[in-house]
A protein has these predicted regions:
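A nucleotide-sugar donor-handling region in carbohydrate enzymes
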Residues: 105-173
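Extreme N-terminal starter segment of soluble prokaryotic enzymes
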Residues: 4-10
Length: 212
């Protein structure tokens, strides 16, 4: 039980699975009763986000009674969160997950992982982004037999490989360094559990595969 158990919430997202997992994880951890508010701006509104206007159909989906909490995540979700913040006022505590790339005034609280550079009086940081894996869930997963993983020798190393994004690009040197590190650990007796992203460059995936 948390002090917010049973409070109402709207989760405002762009529909991306990674964004929704973060918003849902926070809502569940707080014990909120939540509803989804997905936005999909098009044309100029999408290009201007997070600075542009709220979606044209905002008034159809964002109407009183206002929720106790609103959690927004994703660049294109920020205009809707900003407008809700202004309309609901003190009735709704607003939270922006990840760097909203706009004014601190967009929400009551901005929550970013430490690797983001965003800092401010209403900004909090955690080592990583929020997620849905609670201690209870992790304990259950550890205790659940898994034939493939259980056969791997220890130590076991999890390698989660992302990909190129607007703020960062995988270089050939990055791929070589990652592959070299995996090869070195493998020579020391480690086994690996590797997952890639849809944005992982093929050259990186190939380099890692060859190093295993």
């Amino acid at each position: 039980m948390t002090p917010l158990n049973g409070a109402t919430a709207w989760l405002i997202t762009d529909g991306k699975a990674g964004h929704e997992a973060q918003a849902q994880g926070v809502a569940e951890a707080l014990g909120l009763t939540y509803e989804w508010r997905r936005v999909a701006p098009v044309g100029l509104a999408r290009m201007l986000a997070p600075w542009g206007p709220a979606p044209a159909n905002f008034d159809q989906h964002f109407t009183p009674p206002w929720p106790d909490v609103a959690i927004g995540i994703g660049r294109t979700a920020m205009p809707a969160l900003r407008r809700l913040h202004r309309l609901a006022g003190l009735a709704t505590f607003t939270i922006a997950l990840q760097d909203p790339r706009t004014s601190d005034r967009i929400a009551d609280l901005i929550w970013v992982p430490e690797h983001d550079q965003r800092r401010g009086p209403n900004v909090i940081t955690t080592l990583i982004a929020p997620h849905r894996f609670t201690p209870v869930m992790l304990k259950a997963l550890r205790e659940e037999p898994h034939a493939v993983i259980d056969e791997l020798p220890t130590p076991r190393v999890m390698v989660a490989i992302g990909g190129t994004a607007k703020a960062w690009r995988f270089t050939d040197d990055d791929a070589h360094q990652l592959a070299a590190a995996i090869e070195t650990m493998g020579q020391d007796g480690a086994s690996f559990m590797v997952t890639t992203s849809r944005r992982t460059p093929p050259a990186v995936a190939t380099a890692v595969s060859q190093a295993l």
